[in-house]
Amino acid sequence: MTNTPSDQPLKQANQRGAARLAAVQALYQMEIGGTGVLEIVAEFEAHRLGQELDGETYLKADASWFRSIVSGVVRDQRKLDPLIGSALQDDWALSRLDSTVRAILRAGTFELLERKDVPVAVIVTEYVEIAKAFFEDEEPKLVNAVLDRIAKQIRGERRK
């Protein structure tokens, strides 16, 4: 089967989605295990992105997109966390959230800030879907609401 031009956007989108999921996993692993950014990026690129590990084949991911998200979140965390905190309900602190939810919100907020070429709806939808991969109930709704508020604040638009 050959790649036709119409196949390319779908393939690129799927690889970006896989990169987003891997970035969330890497950010989670960094927070829980205290792993540094260089070590985690090297581990994911060598053993996870498009690789087989413990009988599971990881999706092929856009490695540069993955690196951009992980390194950008680490670099900009002091800017991202207050944005996320201001989008949470008054009685919730970022530290109260599950580590996976924090990783999802940080990655999504980073993309909303830095990836102006990607529509808000795409970013929010992708990270809500990632939340659904880990959680069944309230967390995907929380991710949707928080990223939607942040998008309105920094881009002046909501997910449509």
From Swiss-Prot:
HAMAP family assigned: NusB
Entry-linked InterPro entries: NusB-like_sf, NusB_fam, NusB_RsmB_TIM44
Function: Involved in transcription antitermination. Required for transcription of ribosomal RNA (rRNA) genes. Binds specifically to the boxA antiterminator sequence of the ribosomal RNA (rrn) operons.
Recorded superkingdom: Bacteria
A single cellular component GO annotation: cytosol
Protein family: Belongs to the NusB family.
Protein name in UniProt: Transcription antitermination protein NusB
Record has Transferase as a keyword: no
GO molecular function per UniProt: RNA binding
Sorted UniProt keywords: RNA-binding, Transcription, Transcription antitermination, Transcription regulation
Provenance organism: Sinorhizobium fredii (strain NBRC 101917 / NGR234)
GO BP annotation list: DNA-templated transcription termination; transcription antitermination
